[in-house]
Every structure is written in structure tokens, then in C-alpha cells.
């Protein structure tokens, strides 16, 4: 099994991970927001409530044991550049995805706003895994397994969390 090197960093309590794609920004946006696209690498989603600010979605994480369904609130959506989401439930968290295009390359910046830096040890490897699934989906490559990311990347993120 090949171990994936961690790429994320911490900026205060924000976990930041980037990926680059040789594709137009609109194409990458579609991979992130179209239910048929997300169903192939992250999981399907559907609108629950589109009545105004804080529109709600339900999503299924197909890579997680038991394929759990959860809900989240869309806090901001500036197509095709920025998406901010807050998950619902007792373990709620917020994250943002920003896309920037330069020439024929689109850079995705993922930011998870952590309540506590120490949580990076658990969240970092998971987001590395999911963002690599997106890369592999877009490039037609076989998906990797979560155990290639966790626990091998956990110490990297714990070390980052220990640096103030």
C-alpha cells in the first residue's frame, strides 16, 4: 500500500488544503456541485429547503461505513468561485471551497474552520482523502483507500496543531 504524503497546513484554526486541476473553473465547479458528479466520488446530494438564505441540502457520504446521510446549510454560493457550507447535527463544522483560475489551471483551496487546532489530526487525513478522490475522479484514476491516509497522516497534522 502506498502512503500518501500530507499537503495541508494550519493557518490559525483553519485547516487549509489545495489541489490543482488542468481544467476551466466552470468544469471544476461542476465536479463539486453537480449531484451526478459528486455521486461518483463523494456521494449524492439533494436540496431539502431552497426557501432562502441558509438553503439546506442532504448528502450521503459513499466512502464512509454505512453510507451515512447528513444535512448541511449552504451559507454562501458565488458560482463558480466560492462555496461555504456548515454541517448540521451535534458535531457541526464549517468549511469553504474557493476556486481560482490562472491560464488553463484551476486551483481549489479548501478551508475547514476548526473549533480546536488539535482536531486537525482527525480531519486533515479525511479531507486529503476526499480531495484526492476528486482528483482521481476527474483524471479517471482508480480511487485510493482511506487507510492510505489515516492514521499515517495524523501525526503530520498533530505536529502542525502543536505549533502556535
Regions found by a protein language model. Name each.
Residues 19-25:
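A short beta-loop-alpha structural element at the N-terminal edge
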Residues 2-8:
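A detector for short, charged/polar N-terminal pre-domain segments
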Residues 21, 63-65, 78, 89-90, ...:
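A generic beta-sheet turn/junction motif
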Residues 84-138:
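Beta-strand/loop substructures that line and gate deep hydrophobic ligand-binding cavities in soluble
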Residues 9-10, 14-17, 35-76, 80-82, ...:
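Short beta-edge strand/loop motif at the mouth of beta-sheet-based domains
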Residues 7, 73, 94-98:
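Short, surface-exposed charged micro-motifs
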Residues 136-164:
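Short, highly charged C-terminal tails/helix-capping segments
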